[in-house]
A protein has these predicted regions:
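A residue-level marker of the well-folded mature domains of exported/periplasmic proteins
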Residues: 21-321
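Gram-negative bacterial Sec-dependent N-terminal signal peptides
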Residues: 1-23
Length: 321
């Protein structure tokens, strides 16, 4: 099924880029995300789409159907570059695997990275959340939630990561662990779990953690899919009062969990800005204009207490269409 979906994406790409009127009057800058079905990546694509409208750029919206489909994304990148666009914007699925493909692509067109790094020094510019800082923010949010419940930031905590070898997730884990170790001596990391990118796996991991660690007080689920699964497990086991969960990113399900107390806090990026500024930067690079090597697009801790504030509300409810 995955092969079929990638093939369909590549056929769509070829038809889109090679149409007779397509490249005649506007530059083409494809954006390649990790998973076109994910709400997070749909927000990124919405930002890129708006940039295309504002700047007069054709923006093919591409990506595999799962973040674990690394080879699918590599094929899409190679075929995109073969169509000779003005530049390419990509969110690499996996750090090591995308290194060489990005190197090769950058020999032909400017490559702008967003969200997650690859093992390459060939990016013209890289726009992302400072994910180490994002992990620190999550640790602070979790410590505060535990303190509010138990009076002190003390007890057992756990970390759930979606996939191994993903730059952004590794950095979030790094920041989280460093902040816990340096700032919260009363918190003990008793489990560091890595899943397979599926929400059902996160649900099972969280359920097992609840069973194996009866004194568990907090969990950081470091991306949207892991937070979905972990939140579902906490809800099903009625543990929201005793186990505080901090997630990363947001969608309708996680916002619902935030409202009802299943999730204590969400670290929310600005994916719309990431997509918009990715296209804007790529266009500038294609014109040989100077662009920054790195742009931090920011992260914010959102709780039930502040979710209706203007800034936080805009991040939780972006205009996708």
């Amino acid at each position: 099924m995955k092969k079929y979906l990638v093939a369909a994406a590549l056929m769509s790409l070829s038809a889109t880029l090679s149409g007779p009127s397509y490249a005649a009057d506007k530059p083409t800058i494809p954006i390649i995300v990790k998973d076109t079905t994910s709400f997070y990546w749909q927000i990124v694509l919405a930002g890129a789409r708006k940039a295309g409208e504002d700047l007069g750029v054709k923006v093919p919206e591409l990506g595999a159907q799962s973040e674990s489909n690394i080879n699918g994304q590599i094929s899409i990148l190679e075929n995109s570059v073969a169509e000779k666009p003005a530049a390419v914007v990509i969110a690499p699925t996996e750090f090591k695997a995308l290194g060489k493909p990005v190197d090769e692509a950058a020999k032909k067109v400017p490559v702008i990275g967003i969200d997650s790094a690859a093992d390459s020094k060939a990016f013209t510019s890289f726009l992302t959340t400072d994910n180490v800082q994002g992990g620190r923010i999550a640790a602070d949010g979790l410590a505060e939630a535990i303190k509010e419940k138990y009076g002190k930031a003390e007890g057992e905590v756990a970390l759930i990561t979606s996939l191994p070898g993903v730059g952004s997730l590794d950095q979030r884990a790094k920041g989280f662990k460093e902040e816990i170790a340096s700032k919260y001596p009363g918190l003990k990391l008793v489990a560091d779990k890595v899943a397979d990118g599926q929400a059902t796996t996160a649900l099972n991991i969280m359920t097992d953690l609840i069973t194996a660690n009866p004194d568990l007080r907090g969990v950081f689920a470091s991306n949207l899919i892991m937070a979905q699964g972990a939140g579902q497990a906490i809800a099903e086991n009625k543990k929201a009062d005793t186990i505080k969960l901090v997630g990363f990113d947001s969608d309708d399900k996680l916002i619902g969990f935030l409202k009802d107390g299943t999730i204590a806090a969400l670290v929310v990026q600005d994916p719309y800005r990431m997509g918009y500024d990715g296209i804007k930067t790529a266009l500038a690079a294609s014109k040989h204009e100077k662009v920054p090597a790195f742009v931090d697009t920011g992260a914010n801790l959102i709780t039930k207490a502040n979710m209706d504030q203007p800034k936080e509300h805009a991040l939780l409810f972006p205009k996708v269409k």
